[in-house]
Design a protein with these regions (language model features):
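A conserved regulatory-domain signal marking ACT and ACT-like small-molecule sensing domains
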Residues: 1-93
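Short beta-strand/turn micro-motifs composed of small residues
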Residues: 14, 99, 126-127
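Histidine-anchored nucleotide/phosphate-binding helix
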Residues: 103-114
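Short internal beta-strands
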Residues: 120-131
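Short hydrophobic/aromatic-enriched beta-strand-loop microsegments
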Residues: 121-123, 142-148, 194-199
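Donor/substrate-binding cores of folate-linked one-carbon enzymes
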Residues: 128-129, 154, 172-290
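Adenosine-nucleotide cofactor-binding segment
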Residues: 137, 141-169
């Protein structure tokens, strides 16, 4: 990345009030900052204000750490409840992918990374089965096998090993690419806002296992997929992206699975891109995508 492309991204939220935009803008302008992208939104139901701003890094006489230090006083002025993050696009994004046996989402992500459609470093793929080890290693990416067993102690040990492997990578994103294990509450909390799941239904419909079978039994005319952040409540985390495709009376369960996999790949790629570009602002169980 050239110096001309480097940007600092400010994501900010607080209870809405007069003068928020003016205060942040004047803070940046007084320091010589050049805002090249800005977006704002107020949720009228909750009274919460959201903004995302991109500032040219070379327009400021100091770096990201100093920007964060100086912004603390601005955030305090705008309210004790203010929630904010400042990221630096020069910092390479790192990603770990968790998989089981189904490979369509992994294949798609690896292809998008290899073609530079997704600007991220995949530092590891971790699977509870070995079926996807070869394709991972063919892309020059380490594959780690963490088998899960049925007994409670064995599962706890497996999740402990999984946590150590993931945390060692210091990832910005942890993608559950059809990883068919339910994360314990402790990991959900530790990875909050970083762990993304792709669920093969248009949530909140057909939560849990075998959603295509559920959809076929219900006789739906649309099926979909949902990319969401992982929480302790199964398939109930903040939704980042969704999409649907039409199905017909003649479609079998296998047809639904085939059509659904296409949607899963697209929805996961979109949601992941927005996450990596710091375009997602979280508030409770809701997201704002700028």
């Amino acid at each position: 990345m050239s110096a001309d492309d480097r940007r600092y991204i400010i994501r900010f939220g607080c209870p809405d009030r007069r003068g928020i935009v003016a205060r942040i803008s004047s803070f940046l302008a007084d320091a010589g900052g050049w805002i090249v992208e800005a977006a704002y939104h107020t949720d009228r139901d909750t009274g919460w204000f959201f903004t995302r701003q991109e500032v040219l890094a070379d327009s400021l006489p100091f770096g990201a750490d100093e920007l964060r230090t100086r912004f603390v006083s601005v955030a305090k002025e705008l309210g004790a409840q203010a929630d904010w993050r400042i990221s630096d696009t020069a910092q390479r994004r790192r990603m770990v992918i968790l998989v089981s046996r189904e490979g369509h989402c992994l294949y798609d992500l690896l292809g998008r990374v290899a073609s530079r459609e997704l600007d991220v470093d995949v530092t590891a793929v971790i699977g509870n089965h070995l079926e996807l080890a070869d394709i991972t290693r063919a892309h020059g990416i380490p594959f780690f096998h963490v088998p899960f067993v049925a007994d409670q102690d064995g599962r706890a040990a497996a999740f402990g090993q999984l946590a150590q492997l993931v945390d060692a990578q210091r990832p910005h994103a942890i993608v559950l690419a059809r990883f068919m294990q339910v994360l314990p509450a402790g990991l959900c909390a530790a990875w909050a806002g970083r762990a993304l799941n792709i669920h093969h239904s248009f949530l909140p419909s057909f939560v849990g296992a075998r959603p295509y079978h559920q959809a076929h039994a219900r006789g739906v005319k649309l099926i979909g997929a949902t990319c969401h952040y992982v929480t302790a409540e199964l398939d109930a985390g903040p939704i980042i992206e969704q999409d649907v495709t039409r199905v017909y009376h003649r479609d079998s369960v296998s047809d639904l699975v085939r059509k659904g996999r296409d949607i899963e790949k697209i929805v996961l790629a979109r949601g992941l891109r927005w996450h990596l570009e710091d375009r997602v602002l979280l508030h409770g169980n809701h997201t704002v995508i700028f």
